[in-house]
């Protein structure tokens, strides 16, 4: 006997998949979902189980049959006959059951249904459905598949609602990892905060001041050397801080689909003001769509000028509350610890307004903050639990790796057994090192976690061979037509600030079919790797005016499939974007040399011109190819073939090591020893 799936067995025995799964659990048989395969032993057990329940159903049919047969004056000895008699009685009982079943209010299906299956779901005879389809101009048999529209049309005719079931594979748990829990299960959770800003403006010193420890002094050159996550308690409430090495790591995680941050603290030095990296940090935070709190640091310096900082930040739509805006500005001195309490209170205030919640009573889900391979402990991963509760011993899938949580260590180095929402923990027990930004999910069963992890690793390998789908000017028009694009994200880099402003202003005016241009970042100087990472995370196109991408930017753009457009004239940029939006971008061609022939002899013919007797030395010569005449290594003419012959016959092509006769359009000065090079123009796949 071949294996059968849960839903197939349920359908065969006219019971719901849910009831069958409940029955299997009562029989201590583990099934994960309705797609689980049942082996012969389990099927036999189920057959025995449902056969013992049949008499009660038969009794019901017996009562119904007696009523029907009394009306028709036919009766008795119902169960005495065997073989065909039993089958006839079963069929009769089945017909009576069909007659007494009420029409459902709603039916569900997945993918498609055959005419017979639809008839069963609607409690109608297949012939009735076939008749309705015929009236609609559809010739169908009982086993013919019907699409969604046809199913809805027939069901609506009976006044029955239709719902399509979307089956999501557990290997793609990212698709349902962020599903909303019921409101009554949600509990308040700590906010997750990222500190960003220009180099040397005091990001690590601020975090150090918050944690009351001297981290900065121990780090080389005052630069954060790894991504850490720490939790602090303020007024009996917790706040989780992510310590990132600049905004690039923050955006790399977002590019991998991980939205970990709730609030961004933008650190700006009161004596320095807004710097290039400050602007980048603002754009990264805005692209992530998270609230920004501005911490005006170094207020202890004599040159501190907080008003100038406020004035400069208004240009980037960060208007302080004191000036009628909605951005919170907090003056602080991280090195002296002044204003820190006020900053923490503001974080709690934003948390209260935003109402960050999670469900602690479920299996944990979240994101990898950092991961590394330790010689003694094996794979170590810092995880941020975003929903549910992670426990020691939980089977877990992290990106394409899997394992069981062997040990958990908190941010202060203590071993813990459980970690709730917004809690950062360091775990061991994974089979390989995951990447920062990978999502994780805990499961009930280690076997299932292993299967899902292995499947995801295989899928990732296959996906690597394919190309990532990123927005490019070539497919822009198609995506606009399909309604996939409502706004085009652009990153603009130029050689001088004036060019940046002029180009950004011109681009913002473009509006084609209601699709507008959004400039998510501008800057002066070469296109950097940071620009490419932001473009990848935001699905943006990079425009360079009089600037080039550096080596790292080129490499990253190739890996991430980010479209870079380089120009030297502003109106050409505008024209290209508009043309792409209207689907009129000119195709790009490249030349491909397909063959060469050597002129061995020439013949002059009246009214024809010079005929070259040639020998094909390489590749092939085709009738529709372009040709160039090369004499002594110099190209002396470029044009088209007029005729191509083998003996007296016109031919479409002549292959290598064959002789042929050639005439060239509007050119007769052919000489022995000339090389005729044939080429074609091929459209470049962008």
Curated annotation (Swiss-Prot):
Region called G3, residue ranges: 243-246
Keywords: Cytoplasm, GTP-binding, Initiation factor, Nucleotide-binding, Protein biosynthesis
Protein name, as recorded: Translation initiation factor IF-2
InterPro entries for this protein: EF-G-like_DII, IF2_II, IF2_N, P-loop_NTPase, Small_GTP-bd, T_Tr_GTP-bd_dom, TF_IF2_bacterial-like, TIF_IF2
HAMAP family reported for this sequence: IF_2_B
Family statement: Belongs to the TRAFAC class translation factor GTPase superfamily. Classic translation factor GTPase family. IF-2 subfamily.
GO MF entry, a single one: translation initiation factor activity
Domain tr-type G: 188-357
Taxonomic path: Bacteria, Bacillati, Bacillota, Bacilli, Bacillales
Record region (G1): 197-204
Gene that this polypeptide is encoded by: infB
Pfam families named in the record: EF-G_D2, GTP_EFTU, IF-2, IF2_N
Location of this chain's protein in the cell: Cytoplasm
UniProt keyword Ribosomal protein present: no
GO biological process: translational initiation
SUPFAM superfamilies: Initiation factor IF2/eIF5b, domain 3, P-loop containing nucleoside triphosphate hydrolases, Translation proteins
Cross-referenced Gene3D superfamilies: 1.10.10.2480, P-loop containing nucleotide triphosphate hydrolases (3.40.50.300), Translation factors (2.40.30.10), Translation initiation factor IF- 2, domain 3 (3.40.50.10050)
Superkingdom per UniProt: Bacteria
Region ranges (G5): 333-335
GO cellular component: cytoplasm; cytosol
């Amino acid at each position: 006997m071949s294996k059968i799936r849960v839903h197939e067995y349920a359908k065969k025995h006219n019971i719901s998949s849910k009831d069958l799964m409940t029955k299997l659990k009562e029989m201590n048989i583990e099934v994960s979902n309705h797609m689980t395969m049942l082996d012969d032993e389990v099927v036999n057990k189920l057959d025995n189980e449902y056969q013992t329940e049949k008499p009660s159903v038969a009794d019901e049919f017996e009562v119904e049959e007696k009523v029907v047969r009394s009306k028709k004056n036919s009766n008795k000895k119902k169960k005495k006959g065997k073989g065909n008699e039993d089958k006839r009685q079963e069929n009769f009982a089945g017909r009576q059951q069909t007659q007494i079943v009420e029409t459902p209010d709603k039916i569900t299906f997945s993918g498609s249904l055959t005419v017979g299956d639809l008839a069963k779901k609607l409690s109608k005879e297949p012939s009735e459905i076939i008749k309705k389809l015929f009236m609609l101009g559809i010739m169908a048999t009982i086993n013919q598949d019907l699409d969604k529209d046809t199913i809805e049309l027939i069901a609506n005719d009976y006044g029955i609602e239709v719902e399509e079931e979307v089956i999501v594979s557990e290997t793609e748990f990212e698709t349902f990892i962020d599903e909303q829990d019921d409101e009554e299960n949600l509990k308040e959770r700590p906010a997750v905060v990222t500190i960003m800003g220009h180099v040397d403006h005091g990001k690590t010193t601020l975090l150090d001041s918050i944690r009351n420890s001297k981290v900065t002094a121990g780090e080389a050159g005052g630069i954060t050397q790894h991504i850490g996550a720490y939790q602090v308690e303020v007024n009996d409430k917790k706040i989780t801080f992510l310590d990132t090495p600049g905004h690039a790591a923050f955006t790399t995680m977002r590019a991998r689909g991980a939205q970990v941050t709730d609030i961004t603290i933008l650190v700006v030095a009161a004596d320095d003001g807004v710097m290039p990296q400050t602007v980048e940090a603002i754009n990264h935070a805005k692209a992530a769509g998270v609230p920004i709190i501005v911490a005006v640091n170094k207020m202890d310096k004599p040159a501190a000028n907080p008003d100038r900082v406020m004035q400069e930040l208004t240009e980037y739509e960060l208007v302080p509350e004191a000036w009628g805006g909605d951005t919170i500005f907090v003056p602080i001195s991280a090195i002296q610890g002044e204003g820190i309490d006020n900053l923490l209170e503001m974080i709690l205030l934003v948390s209260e307004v935003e109402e960050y919640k999670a469900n602690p009573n479920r299996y944990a889900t979240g994101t990898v903050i950092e991961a590394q391979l330790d010689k003694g402990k094996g794979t170590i991963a810092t995880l941020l639990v975003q929903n549910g509760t992670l426990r020691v011993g939980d089977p877990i899938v992290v990106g394409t790796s899997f394992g069981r949580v062997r040990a958990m260590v908190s941010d202060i180095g203590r071993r813990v057994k459980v970690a709730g929402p917004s809690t950062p923990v360091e775990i061991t027990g994974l089979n390989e090192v995951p990447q920062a930004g990978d999502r994780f999910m805990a499961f009930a069963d280690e076997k299932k976690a292993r299967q899902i992890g292995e499947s995801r690793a295989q899928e990732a390998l296959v996906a690597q061979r394919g190309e990532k789908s990123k927005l490019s000017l070539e497919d822009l028009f198609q995506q606009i037509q399909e309604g996939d694009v409502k706004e085009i994200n652009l990153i603009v880099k130029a050689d001088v600030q004036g060019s940046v402003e002029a180009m950004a202003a011109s681009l913002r005016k473009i509006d084609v079919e209601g699709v507008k241009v959004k400039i998510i970042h501008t800057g002066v100087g070469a296109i950097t790797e940071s620009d490419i990472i932001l473009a990848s995370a935001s699905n943006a196109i990079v425009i360079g005016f009089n600037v080039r991408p550096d080596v790292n930017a080129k490499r990253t753009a190739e890996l991430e499939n980010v479209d870079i457009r380089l120009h030297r004239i502003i109106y050409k940029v505008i024209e290209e974007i508009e043309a792409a939006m209207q689907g009129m971008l000119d195709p790009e061609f490249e030349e491909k040399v397909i063959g060469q022939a050597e002129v061995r002899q020439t013949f002059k013919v009246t009214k024809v011109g010079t005929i070259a007797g040639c020998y094909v030395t390489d590749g092939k010569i085709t009738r529709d190819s372009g040709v160039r005449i090369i004499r002594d290594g110099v190209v002396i003419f470029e044009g088209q073939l007029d005729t191509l012959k083998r003996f007296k016959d016109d031919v479409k092509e002549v292959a290598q090591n064959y002789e042929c006769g050639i005439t060239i359009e509007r050119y007769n000065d052919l000489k022995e020893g000339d090389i005729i090079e044939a080429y074609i123009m091929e459209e470049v796949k962008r």
